[in-house]
Each structure stands twice: as C-alpha cells, then as structure tokens.
Amino acid sequence: MKISIIGSGSKGNSTLIDINNKKILIDVGFSYKYIKEKLEKLKIDPKEIDYLLLTHEHADHIYGLNAFLNKVKPLLLLKEKLYNLLYEKHEYSKIQFLEEVQEVDGIKITVFQLSHDAVDPVGFLIESNEESIVYITDTGYINYKILFKIKDKTYYLIESNHDTELLINGPYPPHLQRRILSDKGHLSNEFCGVYLSKIIGNNTKKVILMHLSETNNNPNIALETTIKILKENEIIFNNIECANQREMVIVKW
C-alpha cells in the first residue's frame, strides 16, 4: 500500500492511493498536465488509474476533471448530487454513485458527510487487508458519529487549514475570515488536534496534515499545535507530517 499526495492546499488537491493492486486518485485539483508529470515521476502512466473519487465541486478539487476523464477514462465515483451539478460540463458514462458503503476490487470505501459550503461534500474511509486510510479535508467540523467510525485507523489524512490567530490578524477580509471559521469552512490547527486526540489509536501509524493555508498557516505551527494538543490529552504520537502545495509527500508501508 502506498499514499502519494500530489499536492494539497488552496491552489489544488490530488492524492493517489495504491492499494490492493489498484490505483485510486482522490480529486483532480490541478491541470491534467501537472498531474501527469507528477505521476510520471512515480513511474505511473495516468491510464493506470482505476478509480477517481471526488470530494466536492470546488475548483481546487476538480480543476483538471474534464481533461482527466477524457484522457484517462477511469471509473468515476462521486455523490449523485455532485454528478447532477457537474453533468452539463462533464458528461461521462463510466460512473458509480457513492453510497454510504461500497466495495470495489476488494477495497471497502465508506463515505461520510462533511460540513463545507459545497453541494454534498464528503470524506472517505478506505480499507483493505486490515489497513485503513481516513481522508478528510474541507470541513468546518467533524461530528461525533463520524469520529466513532474513523477511530483507531492506520493512516489519517486530515485538514489542518489555518492558525486562528494568523487568520484573524492576516490579510483576508472579514467576510472571508468568517467563512473559513464557520461550521461550513475549514478545520483550524486546534480543532484538527482535538479531533486527532479522539481518534488516534494503537493501530495508527502516521498522520498527514492536509490543506494548509499558505497565508494563514505554516507547517511548524501546524505540527507544534497538533503535538501539543495530543500531549495535553496524554497521547504521545510524533509520526506527523504536513502535506505540501507544490511538492509530493509519499508514504509507503
């Protein structure tokens, strides 16, 4: 199993999961050319991608969708509401609507609702052979039912978008600050740490902090905040890394 985060942040998001001899791409928030170049660095032909999962319709998650579908033709898995929104722009036949739970090629994919200013935003729990990946970005909060479902998993790819103080004192106008801080906005470093303190378990191997704002955050602050909150909750876990907007982060096991 291998995770390759092509990029994560407000300018684009895409993550490749190589699991059970299948390749799953989550989101295509970069141009097809950019994703192709990154995949080729991994010695992967884009046409090897078996499945494309979409979280929601914002441009930093679907920017390269049309070109990717036309050139690669993977099975597209997405919520029906999202398909209906995108249909006119991206008519496509190889589609499977996401249910709460589905299995493809021995890979179990559990879908859960997130809270973001989008039509039907979702996160994923991907499981195979007793290994699991939780993928959560673009949400203002995580409810307790989801926390129960995703407790003690192997890998967490979870949003740590902003430092609240940097955001409030930064250049963003008040209406944009309110959007980011709202229940339909983005997770702060502090809330990311609190949620991780409730779900990290004995089976957890690594945490990757996702979707860091380049304006209202930095990796050192995000890491320090998360580790501090974990320690305050008597959890000693230091295998934490930040995803990057421009450089790939690769995790193998």
Please identify what each model-predicted range represents:
Residues 7-8, 28-30, 57, 114-117, ...:
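Active-site metal-binding loops of divalent metal-dependent hydrolases
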Residues 144-243:
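Cap/insert and terminal regions of metallo-dependent hydrolase folds
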Residues 33-78, 154:
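Active-site metal-binding motif and surrounding structural segment of the metallo-beta-lactamase
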Residues 26-29, 49-57, 77-80, 134-137, ...:
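Active-site neighborhood of phospho(di)ester-bond hydrolases with catalytic His/Asp-centered motifs
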Residues 1-42, 122-138, 152-155:
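Conserved beta-strand hairpin/beta-sheet module of binuclear metal-dependent hydrolase folds
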Residues 78-131:
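Metallo-beta-lactamase
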Residues 58-62, 84-85, 118-119, 142-144, ...:
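Active-site environment of divalent metal-dependent phosphoester hydrolases
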Residues 63-72, 85-89, 217-224:
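Metal-dependent catalytic neighborhoods of phosphoester/phosphodiester hydrolases
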